[in-house]
Amino acid sequence: MRVLVIRHHDVDTAGFIAEAFEARGASLDVHLFPDDGPLPGFGGVDHIVVMGSVSSVNDPDPWIAEELAWVRAVDRAGVPVLGICFGAQIICAALGGRVEAMGGNEIGWFTVDSADEDAVPAGPWLEFHEDRCLLPAAATVLARNDAAVQAFRIGRHFAVQFHPEVDGPQLKRWLDSMGAAAVQSAGLDPDQFLADTIREEPAARARADRLVATALAIRDS
């Protein structure tokens, strides 16, 4: 199985999601967009993972328009996508939905109300966003909470608003490079947030593995 990972920041990795795909025999190709140049072709790709970004899908940057068009082309080709946070929002916007600002943020560890906890466990999940999806009619909600739709499927695609990939080192890179002020604005202590994330790692790894199983089941359904 060949998996293409699209990331948007050099401090990001696919973390627990990459581990779960690799445990199933996948080889991962990683492309940093837009820094590494145009989005790659997807011939011979079995699954795509689109990761998060500090940007909003609604920002006027040319690369976002390019990525929206690319996701539409991926959809027409029938290649399944797993979207994470910004990746979920770009699937939503590319396929007929909208993305709106929440008027605040959701940062920290939160549970979700899941339609099927075998497919999408209740969590807790690490959240780090200030936009949310308004889904197209073709989408099916798989989990939500008071802040946002937290997981959905549309066709062969599966998307989550939270960050199942994040471990302690990943969060530390975020806090060091771009995230400490946002965490404080949410009323959290960055050091405690990091400690909570490290403590949660074993359970978070298992939940991420469950999500990859769900993504593959949706792909094959």
Predicted regions: what is each one?
Residues 18-82:
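Flexible gly/pro-rich beta->alpha loop and the following alpha-helix that scaffold active-site loops
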